[in-house]
């Protein structure tokens, strides 16, 4: 998800999306450990999306 798309969401929606991505990251890491993960790049994408969301929430707190 792009940063501009995230900025269009409300803070609670961002936090809900972040929670869902954290669950997905957990599942991806579990799949990686068991050797079932095919697309290892997805872990990086999810981590970066979580970071973008946290950054935007923090920007709103400071504004």
UniProtKB/Swiss-Prot annotation:
Protein family according to the UniProt entry: Belongs to the universal ribosomal protein uL29 family.
Domain of life: Bacteria
A GO term for molecular function: structural constituent of ribosome
The protein, known as: Large ribosomal subunit protein uL29
Keyword vocabulary terms for this entry: Ribonucleoprotein, Ribosomal protein
GO biological process entries: translation
One cellular-component annotation, GO: cytosolic large ribosomal subunit
Source species: Listeria monocytogenes serovar 1/2a (strain ATCC BAA-679 / EGD-e)
Cited InterPro entries: Ribosomal_protein_uL29, Ribosomal_uL29, Ribosomal_uL29_CS, Ribosomal_uL29_sf
Matches recorded under PROSITE patterns: RIBOSOMAL_L29 (PS00579)
NCBIfam families: L29
Pfam families noted in UniProt: Ribosomal_L29
Gene3D superfamilies in UniProt: 1.10.287.310
């Amino acid at each position: 998800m792009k940063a501009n798309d995230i900025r269009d969401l409300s803070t609670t929606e961002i936090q809900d999306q972040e929670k869902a991505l954290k669950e997905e990251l957990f599942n991806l890491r579990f799949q990686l450990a068991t050797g079932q993960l095919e697309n290892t790049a997805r872990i990086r994408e999810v981590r970066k999306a979580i970071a973008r969301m946290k950054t935007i929430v923090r920007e709103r707190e400071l504004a």
